Amino acid sequence: HVEKDNPPQDLIDLNPSQSVPTLVDRELTLWESRIIMEYLDERFPHPPLMPVYPVARGESRLYMQRIEKDWYTLMNVIVNGSSSEADAARKQLREELLAIAPVFGQKPFFLSDEFSLVDCYLAPLLWRLPTLGVEFSGPGAKELKGYMTRVFERDSFLASLTEPEREMRLGRG
C-alpha cells in the first residue's frame, strides 16, 4: 500500500509520475494500469486475455478507453468531488451501468464467452461500487449483478485483491 502524500523512495526513483500501480520487470518499469495489463498479457500469453484478431483487439482497446474515460472519471468525482458533484456522478454511473446492463446478460463476460482484459479493467470499478454508494435495483440489475458475481468468483480475481480491497466487501480474512 502506498500513501499518496508519502510515496516510498524506490517508487520516486522508478516512476516519475509516482503513480500506482507501477510494475518493474527486469530492466523495464511501467505505470498506468492499462499499459501494465496489456504488457502482462503479452509477456504471459497463455491463456490470452486479448482477442487474437486485430479488429477484436482494437474493439477491446476502445471498450477499455471508454471505461476509463467515462466510468473511472465518474468514480474519481465520487471520491474526490464535492458532495453535490459526488451525488451527480454516483447517479450518472448507476444510470450508465444499468443502461448497458443487457450487454452483461448476453454472454458470460463482457461481450465475450471468455474472460478478457476488458473484464480485468472493469472489475476493480465494479468491486468498489458499494464503497462508492452505488447500488442497483430494477431493470438491468439482475444482469449486472450476475456479471459481477461471475467475475468476482474467479480464483484469479480473488487472488489479485489487496487486503484493503478484500476488506471492502469480504471483511477480514
State what each model feature region is.
Residues H1, D10, N15, E135, ...:
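Poly-acidic low-complexity segments
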Residues R26, A123, E163:
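Conserved residues at the C-terminal ends of beta-strands
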Residues H1-P102, P108:
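GST-like domain detector, emphasizing the conserved glutathione-binding G-site
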Residues Y63, I67-S160:
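GST-like fold's C-terminal all-alpha helical module
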Residues E163-G173:
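Acidic/histidine-enriched, glycine/proline-rich intrinsically disordered or flexible terminal extensions
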